[in-house]
Regions:
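Generic beta-strand structural signal
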Residues: 125-127, 133-134, 166-169, 178-181
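Alpha-helical protein-protein interaction elements
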Residues: 2-5, 35, 58, 163, ...
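Generic signature of intrinsically disordered, low-complexity segments enriched in small/polar residues
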Residues: 13-15, 46, 54, 69-70, ...
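Short, well-structured alpha-helical interface segments that form or flank functional binding sites
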Residues: 91, 95, 124, 163-170, ...
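Metal-dependent nuclease catalytic regions and adjoining charged, substrate-binding loops involved
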Residues: 23, 158-160, 170-287
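Metal-dependent nuclease catalytic cores that hydrolyze phosphodiester bonds in DNA/RNA
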Residues: 1-135, 140-158
Length: 287
């Protein structure tokens, strides 16, 4: 375990399962209040029609932000179940904070902050919590992300397409606190862990945020951040080019790559092959 509070929550859950611990009405009421606030936010907040750089999006690839600002009408519509996914994240945060409180772990709850950048711009956002003088985020993760992306800070840094690292550093800088890490809950089975971001180069991250803000504000010409990669099967190239993994969940991938085809894998031998985004098909197989 990477944080003392991990052991506190684990111990509390073990005692609760053995009938040796309960949850106070005060803690339960706070969880209920947080859940109510989450429902209100997801179902009663007005839509965000106007593009704005926020702490929650400032770490996304510049090419994606460019489209968000300059070509929003070509965005792939989000499916209705996306709202449930967002709500699940809020519910996980509410319940996990309740477990922290019930276990005796002390922390300060979420707060709104403003990041003042070196060139004078300001970015607003709301962090999840402060513990031991450090800013932490609570994340719900799929089983794959829990095991692979949130395995360590290094793993997250290699594929941080959602900008979790800049987001956390931005919150910490704005709050005048140290960078903490992420409390990650596996949506598949309830496992949880703490992933520390103590190794982060905060100065470099702030510099990257500044460059992103300048790029978007100056309306510079569009430029892709990623190139397609060769498709491989057992380390052998198929002759096809597929979308970079960083682009997989981008809502503008079809606008960015004309002729992009999302097809069942052309190399997989599985009964139900996974879908792959093909930029170029050159394997010679019949389409």
């Amino acid at each position: 375990m990477n944080h003392p509070a991990e052991l506190q929550v684990f111990s509390y859950l073990q005692k609760a399962m053995n009938g040796e611990a309960t949850m106070t009405e005060e803690v339960a009421n706070q969880v209920a209040s947080d859940v109510k606030a989450a429902l209100d936010k997801q179902f009663n907040s007005p839509p965000r029609d106007e593009f704005k750089l926020r702490m929650s999006n400032i770490g996304k690839p510049k090419c994606q932000l460019w489209f968000e600002k300059n070509d929003p009408e070509d965005k792939i519509p989000l499916p209705p179940h996306f709202l449930i996914n967002m709500l699940l994240g809020d519910l996980v945060e509410a319940v996990f904070k309740g477990l922290l409180r019930a276990s005796g772990a002390e922390f300060k709850d979420n707060d709104n902050v403003t990041l003042k950048l070196p060139d004078g711009q300001e970015i607003q956002g709301e962090y999840d919590m402060e513990m031991d003088g450090k800013i932490d985020d609570v994340k719900s993760a799929s089983p794959w992300s829990y095991t692979n992306k949130f395995d360590s800070f290094e793993s997250l840094q290699k594929g941080d397409g959602f900008g979790y690292i800049p987001q956390l550093v931005g919150y910490s800088k704005a709050a005048g606190k140290e960078v903490g890490g992420w409390w990650v809950v596996n949506k598949g089975n309830g496992e949880f862990k703490y992933v520390s971001a103590s190794e982060v180069d905060s100065e470099q991250v702030i510099q990257d945020i500044q460059e992103t803000v300048n790029y978007i504000e100056k309306d510079e010409p569009f430029k892709r951040c990623f190139e397609p990669v060769p498709e491989t099967y057992f380390k052998k190239q198929s002759g096809n080019l597929v979308l970079n993994s960083a682009c997989k969940f981008c809502s503008f991938k079809h606008k960015c790559w004309k002729g992009l085809k999302t097809l069942p894998s052309r190399v997989s031998k599985a009964k139900n092959p996974p879908e792959v985004d093909y930029v170029l098909i050159g394997d010679g197989l019949a389409t």
